[in-house]
Amino acid sequence: MGLGLAFLASCSKEEITVADTQPQNSTSSNQAEVSSESVVRRGQSYIILSSTDNLPGDLASQMQAANGTLTGELSGAGLALATSTDPDFAAKASRISGVRSVIHDFTYQGFAPNSARDVEAVTESDNTNPATSADNDRFFPLQWGHTAIQAPEAWNTGARGKGALVAVLDGGFDLTHPDLVANIAGSKSFVPGEAAQFKGSAFSHGTHTAGTIGAVDNNLGVVGVAPEAKLLLVKVLADGGSGSFSWMIQGIYYAVSQQADVINMSLGAAIPNSSKYRDDNGTPEDTSDDKWVNDTKEIQELLVAISKATSYATKNGVTVIASAGNDANNGQRDKNLVHIPSGATDVISISATGPMGWALKPLETNLDRMASYTNFGTSDVEFAAPGGDAVYPGDDIASIAGVTQYAFAFDMVFSLTSQGRYTWSAGTSMAGPHAAGVAALIVGKAGGQLDPSRVRAIMRASADDLGKPGRDPYYGYGRVNALRAVSQAF
């Protein structure tokens, strides 16, 4: 990357998104890099890390004695949240017996509020030639990712995700989308002042990822990888794309409390180990009093905090999946970046694949081509999954399932968006949900509730080993395969 800091809600750069039933060309990939000014230290908000998985006793009164206010306790994860206007609060609270460290919370801009290109989204009525498929969902022929991972073949064995609960930690969701509503088990927002429902007509990142995992097989638009899994929709990013790590932590903890089997996080940040960060000085709406700080230890402890949350989830039976990031970064060579949450303990990190020109030659195009933007690295990627791409050159037009568009659009992942519509997007954010869907199929095949270590082992044993034999920098242990996964011995 040209800049030292990048973020993702989708993972680092904005995803490429386009939608329309009639072609509207654009040569811009709309993948804007984000400067270091986009990560902001919250001057009066703190994350407390315990030395163990248990919190010190009478923590509220001890926080008060340190001039702080305890705002949340995550018992079992060894984490707590607090606020304080005292600039010396962190130092004071760190001296409490049993406290490992006290760090500031950080906010980041995960994706632009209007990251989609300025086009109309696809609706059911736009389909002038409804296609016939195994499941009869009208836009199923656009879902090349399902073909790549052999999802239909997995369904034919009877494995459809029934009995699995997937928590989707993301931005807002279209809770009334006809292709989603029947599978929604619940929703929750940790974004102050915003409900879980996505407002407006812009691209809905959360709705898109949720649809890939578990859109209902109902003879409508699309179908999810695990169409009978239930979805717990947890909002940890604002509709405008911003988020904080404390919201992420609370979302993970909540998913555990609701007995989720799988967590998908198509979000996060790639932060330099050593860099200057902006502190909002406790006034996030007023930038005139901001200051710049440099605290390498605080970033390292932030990764520890997220790792405590993800480890807590894993210990409580939740398989945690996160997108690897969209910076085309070689994690083996560049050790300066801290990837959160994909680099946290017990997290399964997913890279992205995507075809080039698939709509023009669907039977000849390689669906397992590595996406141009995906992060990679032998220790940074565990599995690959379909994430799409938009690098096909030229103005060729294609038509599939009654939808006519420039050929490059069909190389992206087609799923749900706001106001009951459908759209394309590309990014490792789209890859993670394919892998989470496979994990849900595994849990469902096992009858519900399967130890994360077993889910991981099945995913590893069943992945298609592409690239160099064994674990390689691009595909990890391989591209996930739904059919092979549900065919393993349970």
Summary of predicted features, one role per range:
Residues 49-52, 84-85, 104-107, 168-172, ...:
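Active-site-proximal beta-strand/loop segments in catalytic clefts of secreted hydrolases
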Residues 17-118:
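Inhibitory N-terminal propeptides of secreted protease zymogens
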Residues 127-135, 195-199, 273-301, 330-336, ...:
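Surface-exposed intrinsically disordered loops and tails
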Residues 210-212, 232-241, 253, 261-262, ...:
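Hydrolase catalytic cores
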